[in-house]
């Protein structure tokens, strides 16, 4: 008989006598705040996980069991709020991006969700992808291998787009963002060090002092 004990989304322990099906492994959830100047009181399933969830903040991984989970935020400066439901599968890592967009009533808070479901990197390879949550238009991006000749274009690079994972050799890689049809560098993000079997997401964000900034989100280890 198994008697799993769930500690409010943060841990899973079980007493196991060796019979019955294996308990769910759970998934890892991270949230990234991409709205300059905004801050929220962030809760997952009613439990406050960050009382000052502000621009550029990436939460530590939160373990969630398969099923529906409520993600809530209340602005610390006005009446803005969000209340979303994430349907989590087992053994899948999720990134939820808190962003703003334009709706029928003006600016609204919206979510972007990315997961690492899929086969993962090929044997001996790592994987990289880009999540673009900057509103700067007219840009292109590619990954460049540090000290090598490797270069991998990013196929989807526009506001709220999350590219597919691209397999790359292990090593140090940087994301280079330029204006379309130009050789300038708007953002150089990295280097990002990856070993075989790892997957990483580079999130591109707007920035107050400059046009762009970035955050690195671990996916698979």
Where are these regions (language model features)?
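Sec-dependent bacterial lipoprotein signal peptides
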Residues: 1-13
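Intrinsically disordered, low-complexity polar regions and short flexible loop motifs
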Residues: 15-221
